[in-house]
Amino acid sequence: MNSMDKNQQSSQNELDLGLNQEPITPKKTIQPSSSILGKAKGLFAKKNHVQTNFQQRKEPTFGDSSTQENDPLIPSENLKKVQKPVLQTSSTEENISAVDEEISAENNADEPVEKAEKPILAQPEKWKILQVLPAKHRRLFMAIFVLVILLIIFFALKPSSDTVESFTQSNSNEVPVQFQSLDQSQPLETTILDNPPAQNQMAVEQANQSEFAPKAEEAANNTTAQNPLVENAPMQQNVVQSPSQMPNEMAAASVAPMQPAQAEQPKATVPVQPMKKAVEPQVAHKDTVKKEVKVAEKAQAPAKATEQNVAKTAGNAPIVEAKPVQAKKEKKVQIVDAKPVSKSTASRLSAKTLTVPKGVSLMQLFRDNQLNISDVNAMSKATGAGNVLSSFKSGDKVTVSVNNQGRVNEMRLSNGARFVRQSDGSYQYKK
């Protein structure tokens, strides 16, 4: 042990060289520079870094070798153990503070970007587009602008109310879809719903003319066949009408030459009682005419020349004027012949009795029997009809009278109610 102490003391003396014998200790710890990753690892690492420290020197003593020998020597390992905790705590605290500062700096660098983006979107008054407007009116302008856009979208997507009506009725001049006939080749007929009243009146007048034209022809044929003297009737009427238009004096002058002709008729022919009866009122009429002639001659003298001319024309055609009774008979015959003509027109209206089967509507029943379905539509519009046409039961009977044009003039229901066609094409409901 003594040899070891001597060697150490000799080596210590060589190092001192007469300089200051105070112990030399480092004033600042040397910290190794590490990266950010290394610093982050240092936060979680619990191991102690071993640092090389200088050995503690002993002060040189002169003459007291015994005391030096007797003093206990503290090994360097113990010194290291005592000094390490102090040095290590300071380094770890500095490392932790440095890492915290760097992490906080990075977080602070990211936060301003997010904070800068939020105010731009949340504050429209700071938008560059709205810099023209005052700052206090920018929010109001944006609210009004958004409301206008929403209204435009709403009205653009709103469906039109005419879509349903366009499918049911395409045009005002056409028959609705539900009332069109299945046979497309059949021409469309005019109804009160499709045409104005003026056109309906023209159609009714034409129909009446077409109905009465054949009646007049038949009546003319019957009269010409029965009476061959009908050709002379216009001349007789002209001769009879001319005295009525002239003054009473001219009428008296025309009746005077008729007397010999009428007196000759019973002599030439066999005396017949009706002829005598017809002549007697004419004689009585002559007396009244003579009295009127006398009064007229006193009042109007210059009219004699015209009376003579009329008398001459009446005397030249005594044969035509000699048969006034036959003309009256012919007129009566024409009236009698006109009655069966009206019966024939009534017979032209064909009547049908239709039975409503189960599950079939009146419109389908008309369609099956080749009737005009537009008449059903017109009947449904009659005042007071209500739901009569849609409340049929299976087995109900309907009597329909149709004219020569195929239109329904009258329809009688099983309960006694009737639908009567009017001149304008509409129907009247009668219970």
From Swiss-Prot:
Q: Name the GO cellular-component terms.
A: extracellular region
Q: Provide the function of this protein.
A: Cell envelope protein involved in phase variation, confers opaque colony phenotype.
Q: Where in this protein does the record put region Disordered?
A: 1-98
For this chain, the family text in UniProt reads:
Belongs to the OapA family.
Q: Which organism is it from?
A: Haemophilus influenzae (strain ATCC 51907 / DSM 11121 / KW20 / Rd)
Its subcellular locations are: Secreted
UniProtKB keywords: Secreted, Virulence
Q: What is this protein called?
A: Opacity-associated protein OapA
**Lineage start:** Bacteria, Pseudomonadati, Pseudomonadota, Gammaproteobacteria, Pasteurellales
Q: What is its main location?
A: secreted
* Description of the deletion phenotype: Loss of the ability to colonize the nasopharynx of infant rats.
